[in-house]
Amino acid sequence: MEEGELKIIVERIQDPDIDIQNNALNMLFDVTKSSHSKSIDTINFQYLADNLDVLEDVCKRLEGNKKRWLCDIISAICVVDDERKLLAYRVEGNIIDLKEWGHLYVKKLIGCIADVKNNKMDFPFAKTRDVGRECIDFLFKHNAEFEAIDFLVEVGGIETVLDYVDTHNYNRIVLYLEDMNSFVDLEEVILKIYLKMGDHSRYVVGLIRRQKSKEAIEYVRSIEDRDYKKQCLYILARCNLYYEASDPEEKYILSNGYIKDVYREIGAELEIDKPSKMDAILKGFKYDKDTRQLASIGIANGFVHMGYGRDPIFLPQEGDSRVPLDYEAILGCDVPDLISVFGSIGVIESWNSEKVMETLQEHIFADFSYRKTGSLLGLALSGLRNFEERPAILALLSNNLQSSSSIHVIATLLGIEAMFSGTQAEEVRELLQPLMFSDSSEVVFFTSFTLGSVFCGSADEDLTSLMLQTFVEKGKESETQFFRFLMLGLASLFYRRKDVECGIMEIGGALSKHESILIKGFQYVGTGDSNVIESILTDSFTGDTDALLESLGLLSCALVSMGDETSSQMVGRIVSSSLLLDSSHLRSVLPLCYSILYPSNPQVNVLDMLEKSLNIGETNCIISTIVSLGLIGAGTLNSRITKILDQQYSYYYKDSKVLPVLKIAQGLVSLGKGLLSISPLYFDKTTFMPKNTIGLFSTVFMLLDSSISPLVSSHAYMFFLLCQACTQKYVTCSEKINIRVGHPINTVGMVGEPKKLSSVQTHTSPVVLSEKIRAETDENVCSSYIEDVLILKKN
């Protein structure tokens, strides 16, 4: 429009004739609207902005809707110039529909309201509420949910999003809020959205993620739809949550009785149920006279055949290939290695404690011996997730705690820890608390770890006080390896409890600073909080060099970064950069950090780094690197890791410390023949399982000084800590369905319904998923998470 025409419109607005004035206002509206529709017509806006004082004078003389109409027009004109007037006139007018001005104007308007909220603009915030509500309406109606959510978070009104969620935008909104939840606590709003939309699986998982286990159980009990309830029961069972149910089917699912049947059916369907040959693990083993390798071979064999109920050594079936091992001769020698051997039988029969009881009955009810202790450990490991059998198994284990030998008591405690980790079972407290006053320091320290693991995340005051007292009284033994179990137990109590302070620094004593750093790592597990990482590194690397403190600092940073891709990469670079300090303890801790960051998730650059670590020549570094290769490759059958480990045999076949861990690492790579993982993250990698996290971290933590670690020197059976970290990585369904698998695409903030997977392949269930792969299906299943066991919703 020509400048002259604009001039006439401005003049006519001042005309006393009402009709002329109305026409001029309508023309001004049309000009302003057309300028907005062209993004911004600078010529029109510039002229109108220069004559804004004239329009403002006219506005003062007008009344009623005409005045409000002109206020809105003036507000729209101010979009290129005066933000305060833009907001003030819109608040005064607020009569013209926002869609007339378009998205750019609304975006500018919400920016002004946010500035008012943050005291960057002098204007009463209360007066902006109606305008803000209209802006939110506009944004949600025009598929700009993400800008609306950003605005609501900025002004502290995120609860309003509940009014706008529907089936059309639900997935986009939830995905965006879940991603934003890493920076702002939006969990309560997200849970309310799940509840509103009737998304049972996400709601239950959300409660579990918030450590609201009781609410999750009560909600599942209240679900009336049979199929959805059944699906949520599988979720509870997977997260080790149990309640007494009268329905036999509910009881069967909740007690994890289904795992054995489903797991073995999938193994048979994939034709991997027959025993593996294990040539690499048995290489160089002399069956007739070599008993020193029994423990490591038993553990490795247990990991490979975990859950299948058959193997080539102890439990072969008719027609299976067998290892020519004299089983009777093994039973004849009562040596500590038998704890690992019999424990491995329980691992092979995982989720089938009845069979273990039948197989090892004569040893379980015998007098104190390594055979009995190993059999009890095996029984506990077989009942790791079976809630029905726990009371009976605990009763059998409790008798063995009366032994005068610490190795028997510790192995029994390991079985109790594996079964009850994360359950906060009071019967375990009553049973174990007297052992905190045992004459054996090793028993005291391992009891602390067991209690910490059982009550992880509870911040229990009585246990905290008891462990702090032990921490001070046993300070003289802080240099021993078993003292670290006390440190682990105390830290476990504060798992993901940022709201509680331990007070370890106030009591002082040896390793109090070390413990405070470990506790901070546990408090912020998986948050990826860069400020916490910076704080830990500052505390660890300031002052004189302290090998344990620096190692703990890096491990705690890895713990904080678990599950967060960006943070994991950052900490990975920090850890690799620490090698520039040229310290042997940092060279040893590097592979351990990687095994926390990438469990069952081999990365090419990480394997390159670990392969170089094997050439350093320091025993500590070699052992921690070999175990880390096993942890990173656990259950992946990764050919490169297998090749690297095979190559090490020719160097270390005579090394009594390296060879056992080499065999165990080889067993880990073939964990469950590829059906199992040790990743502690469930449900699209959003939810940490405390039991799995503690099982993984405690194994890694106890390898800090690996050449003198109990796991390497005298207590090899402690590698069974990893059993509680094992989880099935298959997807199966109550009926055969098509499942698409592929690499996940980050669709956060994308409009419409973009594809969520790339490199897609379609398979019929069951399907095995690696760490980098996700699944989806078009079938009407009862879960939003395509993992584990799915229930097909019947029409």
Curated annotation (Swiss-Prot):
The keyword Protease does not apply. One of its GO terms (cellular component) is proteasome regulatory particle, base subcomplex. This is 26S proteasome regulatory subunit RPN1. It holds the Pfam family PC_rep. The lineage of its organism: Eukaryota, Fungi, Fungi incertae sedis, Microsporidia, Unikaryonidae. SUPFAM superfamilies: ARM repeat (SSF48371). It is found in: Cytoplasm; Nucleus. Acts as a regulatory subunit of the 26S proteasome which degrades poly-ubiquitinated proteins in the cytoplasm and in the nucleus. It is essential for the regulated turnover of proteins and for the removal of misfolded proteins. The proteasome is a multicatalytic proteinase complex that is characterized by its ability to cleave peptides with Arg, Phe, Tyr, Leu, and Glu adjacent to the leaving group at neutral or slightly basic pH. Belongs to the proteasome subunit S2 family. One of its GO terms (biological process) is proteasome-mediated ubiquitin-dependent protein catabolic process. It comes from Encephalitozoon cuniculi (strain GB-M1) (Microsporidian parasite). InterPro entries: ARM-like, ARM-type_fold, Proteasome/cyclosome_rpt, RPN1_C, RPN1_N. PC repeats lie at residues 374-410, 411-445, 447-480, 624-658. The 26S proteasome consists of a 20S proteasome core and two 19S regulatory subunits. The 20S proteasome core is composed of 28 subunits that are arranged in four stacked rings, resulting in a barrel-shaped structure. The two end rings are each formed by seven alpha subunits, and the two central rings are each formed by seven beta subunits. The catalytic chamber with the active sites is on the inside of the barrel.
